[in-house]
Amino acid sequence: MTQVPNRETPRGIAILARFLASESAGGIVLMVAALAALIVANSPLSAGYFSILHSVWLGLSVELWINDGLMAIFFLMVGLEIKREVLAGGLASWGQRALPGFAAAGGMLVPALIYIAINWGNPQTLSGWAIPAATDIAFALGVLSLLGNRVPTSLKVFLAALAILDDLGAVTIIAFFYSAGLNLPMLAAAFVTLAVLIVMNRLNVRRLLPYLLLGALLWFFVLQSGVHATLAGVALALCIPMGKPEEEARSPLLFLEEKMHYWVAFAVVPIFGFANAGVSLAGITLGNLVDPVPLGVALGLFVGKQIGVFLAAVLAIRAGLAVLPEGSNWVQLYGVAMLCGIGFTMSLFIGNLAFPGSQHLIDEVKVGVLIGSGLAAIAGIVLLRSRFSRP
């Protein structure tokens, strides 16, 4: 008797492959990881969850390995994307950078001002001013992709470019405002390592292994120097050779970016989300939600982002410095500005840097980020699905 082949497994694999290849997959997986963290942190499993995060391995807690180690890989990916877009992508010319550049600047300035206004007079909480200034590129693009062809491709490109420039701004903020207690010998060692990487780039060394080995050494020196270790990822990315457009098939940067994409989207970022979104809601009242930190973060993300991004974009377009994305209208642009308030990954990350050693304030940041990002996602989807956003 001939055995009938089992077609279910290949079909299931095909469905999984299509999901992983979709634009929304990374955002959905991150959303699930964050929701799982919230559930676990408010269940009988919470003691084990927090115990694992605070357990020490090789001198660092698991939480620090995730935030300083795994996130360096995330920032390496961010750096690769920034370099690619600036050299040969959607940010290759000043004209292409204009609208997302102005919008990103407005989208960082206004949320920070709102947070500062709410926390004025409290030096301890004022240090969190940069928390609502960030946009989560995976989350925002994931939500936008759920809308399908309701949103023109030009707006998706605009949001991606804006988020990349936003990430560049966040990296700059971390470098200048959240690095303290410098260890000069280690910092010097980091600069020497970086200099070697730059020389390798100038000599057109195209093998990735030497870059990655020196990158790991650079990460160690930066970690010990007092500068935040994740910046080593960005520095390494900028040293990876891009090559000429006609050499795209042999580009070390494009090869590494392609190989890292799934690991970052479906492992690094979800692990970070699971480790950092868990906050116990026990004892939290409505009164706690209007404390300066969660209120400043939530309003900065939900209100500040949409106002800052949209207002800066309108001023740039009216001044003739930029043009409205092709095939889009003002309502659609405003809907995308709302989605920029999804600040999950980078906002939580900066929150950990702003309030080291204060679990209470970090928990307040988590609450503010979850509320602000959630409201921004819901409002953006509702507006972009409404009849007002149709061309």
Swiss-Prot record:
Give the record's keywords alphabetically: Antiport, Cell inner membrane, Cell membrane, Ion transport, Membrane, Sodium, Sodium transport, Transmembrane, Transmembrane helix, Transport
Q: Which GO terms describe its biological process?
A: regulation of pH
Membrane-crossing ranges are 25-45, 56-76, 98-118, 128-148, 157-177, 180-200, 208-228, 264-284, 297-317, 335-355, 364-384
Q: Topology versus the membrane, per the UniProt entry?
A: Multi-pass membrane protein
According to its UniProt record, where is this protein mainly located?
membrane
Q: Where in the cell is it found?
A: Cell inner membrane
Q: Which reaction does it catalyse?
A: Na(+)(in) + 2 H(+)(out) = Na(+)(out) + 2 H(+)(in)
The cross-references to Pfam families, in alphabetical order and at most eight, read:
Na_H_antiport_1
Which domain of life does this protein belong to?
A: Bacteria
Q: Report the GO terms under cellular component.
A: plasma membrane
Q: What does this protein do?
A: Na(+)/H(+) antiporter that extrudes sodium in exchange for external protons.
Under the heading HAMAP family, the entry gives: NhaA
User: Per the similarity annotation, which family is this?
Assistant: Belongs to the NhaA Na(+)/H(+) (TC 2.A.33) antiporter family.
Which PANTHER family does the record associate with it? NA(+)_H(+) ANTIPORTER NHAA, SODIUM ION/PROTON ANTIPORTER NHAA-RELATED
Q: What is this protein called?
A: Na(+)/H(+) antiporter NhaA 1
